[in-house]
């Protein structure tokens, strides 16, 4: 298990754009499972929507991508590098995510060739699928 401080050592995201609270499982370079506790105090709820708060789908996908990045960047050869979100296919939103929900974020790498990879991503709330997608990422270095 990884806590928030350990996650911040792996991926560069910070508040308000760090969308993973903890990692429950990680199989380096292959798979990770994370948790996002969705609070009523999230900034995005101010405008999405003021009278009926729903987590934006793009942020659910971003949370999945961050969990995938942890899996990929935990691999020894990728430590200190960045995982860039490069694409999304077959994305479907099946359940609204509301304040008080706990998102379980699972990403499993399905194909990796050199610096490019694909993963199957599923976000669930109480065992029900909220979002599923195939995400593509690219491993790169920081440019000075």
Curated annotation (Swiss-Prot):
It is found in: Cytoplasm. Belongs to the thioester dehydratase family. FabZ subfamily. It catalyses: a (3R)-hydroxyacyl-[ACP] = a (2E)-enoyl-[ACP] + H2O. The keyword Lyase applies. Involved in unsaturated fatty acids biosynthesis. Catalyzes the dehydration of short chain beta-hydroxyacyl-ACPs and long chain saturated and unsaturated beta-hydroxyacyl-ACPs. The keyword Chaperone does not apply. NCBIfam families: fabZ, PRK00006.1. It is an enzyme of class 4 (lyase). InterPro entries: FabA_FabZ, FabZ, HotDog_dom_sf. GO terms for biological process: fatty acid biosynthetic process; lipid A biosynthetic process. The active site is at residue 48. This is 3-hydroxyacyl-[acyl-carrier-protein] dehydratase FabZ. Its EC number is 4.2.1.59. One of its GO terms (molecular function) is (3R)-hydroxyacyl-[acyl-carrier-protein] dehydratase activity. It comes from Bacillus cereus (strain AH187). Keywords: Cytoplasm, Lipid A biosynthesis, Lipid biosynthesis, Lipid metabolism, Lyase. GO terms for cellular component: cytoplasm; membrane. PANTHER family: 3-HYDROXYACYL-[ACYL-CARRIER-PROTEIN] DEHYDRATASE (PTHR30272:SF1).
